[in-house]
Amino acid sequence: MNPVIGLDIAKGESKGQVFLQKGKPHGKSFDIQHTKEGLSQLQEILLSVEEMAGASPTVIFESTGHYHTPISQFLEEHQFVYILVNPLIAHQAKKSSLRKVKTDTLDAYRLCELFYKEEFEPHKQRGLKLLELRNLTRQHDAITNLLIQTKLQFHAILDQVFPEFRGVFGDLYSKVSIHVLSEFPTAESVLASSETDLANRIAARCPSRSTRWAADKANKLMAAAERNPFRAPRLQSHLLSLEMYIKILLQYQEHLSALEKQIDALAMDLEEYLIIQSIPGIGGKIAATIIAEIGEIDRFNHPKKLVAFAGVDPSVFSSGKFTATINRISKRGSSRLRHSLYLAVLCSLRKSGSKRLKAFYDRKRQEGKPHKVGIIACTNKLLHWIYVLLQRKEPFLDMA
């Protein structure tokens, strides 16, 4: 017998169905809660099916973000084999029936049927370090997106309170710039202070700079206050919003700095991190994201599978005598990996980047390929290089 248990996972609970072999469901469907008692119930079901069928059952369920984490972690701890199905494949299987019926019980039933139709590979447990790195890099991306949104809102408020402040410091979001703005949020507060006092405040915020630099910034700040179209905002709510956004910006910057330190410390212990960084143009953050999203390279037995995992494989459409000649990439893989590879290619095509990749890009352009097509071709080529480098555990050798 080849037993399988299909689980339709939802938030905090799952609906299950047991098959002892193809076409032979066993018993009625069951419910389990994602609690200690519920997982113990699942273990009892697994052991009873194993005793009945004479073989350990495989558990199959759809990838549901973080909802399936309690189930997958429990199965790994108790060394049960499970298959994590791509949601797209599961969705296509659910649509195979002519009847428009959708229930959790039926979904679990169809997952069992899908197990016998397709040849799935058991899910391979990833190393803890790579999982930690993946979570850290994803958290970094999430906070970066929040920081970008906050900057946009901060800009809108600054335009209504102190628009001329933008040109005072080279980087509006540097710590010294943000702290000075928090102390002097309006043109009125700047003009109420002397230029010497401003210079001393700026110098205290940035002790690594010279007093001459602080005096120059104080002069620019005073000039900006004089040029500002209004001394103080008409609405006090704008001033409160500005103070709030300043605090949020500083908090996000602090969180990102802490995450970057943890990512660097964790990545330095991984051999793959140094191997990918040997490719000219790829820095620490991009290298960490790439290896975190790829995971163990042994999961892929061919570079084309890695290309498909990144979603940069071409989509193909052919019907009858028609075959499409303009094919877009599938975009069905890891979007974070795809974005990191895109940035890696752009960096590698610079003067200080990879000469081999630049030569490959130039060749594609000479063939008449548009810029974006050349970039995707370079992404595909870069993935093949990464696959070989990680398999052989060798650094990248560029053209002389």
Name each model feature, range by range.
Residues 1-400:
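A detector of single, family-specific signature residues
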